[in-house]
Amino acid sequence: AYGIVSNVTDEKSVQDMVDEIVEKFGRLDVLVNNAGISQKVTVEDMTLDDMKRIFNVNMFGLFLVTQKCMKVMRAQKYGRIVNLSSVSGKRGGGIFGGAHYSASKAAVLAFSKNLSREICAEGITVNSVCPGLINTEIWKSLPKEEADKVIDGIPMGRPGETQEVANAIVFLASKEASYITGEEIDINGGSHMD
C-alpha cells in the first residue's frame, strides 16, 4: 500500500497527488472517489455555508479528483472510476445526513452518468455505488431504540458490512466489468429498490 494525503477541495493538492501516483507507478488504472462528509440538520436550520461545505467535499472534490485522474486514463485508453453516492441520493432523507447531503449524493449520480457518456468509448468506465446503512462506528453510536427502528426498514434485517460495499467496488474496478458503465449499484439490504 502507498498512502498520499490530499485535500480533495484544493486543485493543486489534487494535481500533486495525481502527479505523485503517476511518477511512482507509471499509470493510474482505478479511481474510487470515497471522500465524503455529512451533517444532520434540517433545511430550516441549515446555513448556506453548511450547504457549500458538504458540496465542496462530496461533489466538487469528486469533480476535481476525477478531472485530474481521467486525463491520465484517457492518455492510456483505460480506466475505472467508481464513485460513492448513497441511498440518500436516490430517495432523499437519511439517518445521518440532511437535505444537503442527499442533494450532493444525487449530484454524484447525475455527474457519473454524464461523464460515462463522455468517455466510455475511450476504455474508461464510470459507475456509482449507493450504500445504505453500513455497520460503521457512526451506526454503532446510535441509541438502541433508534437503531431498531432503522433495522425495521431494512428487509434483510441488518446493516451492511463494509466488505460488502468493497466487493461491489472491486468488481466495478475489474476487467470483468468492462461492459458496465453509467450504472448505480444499490447496496442496502433491500431498503430501497429501483
Set out the residue ranges of the language-model regions.
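Alpha-helical segment proximal to the catalytic Tyr-Lys
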Residues: K71, K113, R117-A121, S178
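Residue(s) in the substrate-gating loop at a strand-loop-helix junction
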Residues: S86
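Active-site helix of classical SDR
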Residues: T66, S104, S112
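C-terminal helical subdomain
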Residues: L109, A121, S128, K149-E176, ...
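Conserved NAD(P)H cofactor-binding loop of Rossmann-fold oxidoreductase domains
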Residues: A35-Q39, G190
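The beta1-alpha1 cofactor-binding region of Rossmann-like NAD(H)/NADP(H)-dependent oxidoreductases
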Residues: V5-D16, L48, Q163-E164
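Substrate-binding pocket helix/loop in short-chain dehydrogenase/reductase
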Residues: T42-V43, D50-F55, W139, E146, ...
